[in-house]
Amino acid sequence: MLSVGSLLPDIHSARLIMISKTPLPITVRRMDFDIPELPRYWYKGNAWTTHFMNALSTTFPDGERFFIHAVRNYEKEITDPELRAQIRAFIGQEANHGKEHEAFNQALIDQHKLPLEKKLIFMKKALGFAKKKYSRREQLALTVGFEHFTAILANLMLKQTDVIEEVQGMTADMFMWHAVEETEHKAVAFDVFTATEDDYWLRVRGMAQATFFFLLITMRMQYSLLRHDNQLGNWRDALGFAKFLLVKPGMFTRIIPEYLDFYRPGFHPWQHDNRHLISERVKELESYALRAVNAA
């Protein structure tokens, strides 16, 4: 377990004070989820919402590797031992997220013959292009934006547990584990950026670009999967998906205040302190990991 403190004792440097605001341990958990036989439309039987979640999962493996790459580019420049420990924990967690979502994506391919291979190749090429086109500071700003996006979505899942709990078995456990760990490390990339670049306009530009790419890629993949399943004309599920986004749980509408707060000068992710939401979830994850070890 890697533990990180709350504030550095150096009160003379505003930048150093900003570095270590993560107020809880960042724990690397190797879960090894056993993906069960899934219904084709595993999210409440809704094709549109299921393929939205499938599209999210498809972006994760190479997305997580891109985030690791962007943060690792700056690792040698960080001298603060607490932030260096956070970086190592961040890398460990993100690597495990990529591995588990790769297994989940492969299960979708094997069980339902979903055409994810081309989409995974597209993600790899798109992020390879980003590494070539964007400078390392732009890559880090983009990562900070994506990390905030995933953190506020994770916060919604933790606050409104029915988002995931109505999904049965290991699928629910995997997404909740991901939400817990995205919360634990939500400030790491931000603090690396603050310690090395600290450029407000670069930060907000990175968030705007991350938003554009997130919506474009996710919606493109969802559309493709719906077309493959001949579900584009399923208006009942389309309306159910609209309710999912806009009403209950309000996957998009309820994150708007936290999303907009990112654009405020002086913002820090832990100004949205949601430690209380993960304490019980952490106990559940530790119990699950212990059961998995005993069963092995």
Question: Whereabouts are the PLM-identified features?
Answer:
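Non-heme di-metal
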Residues: 17-296
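N-terminal amphipathic/basic-hydrophobic helices that include classical n-h-c signal peptides
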Residues: 1-17
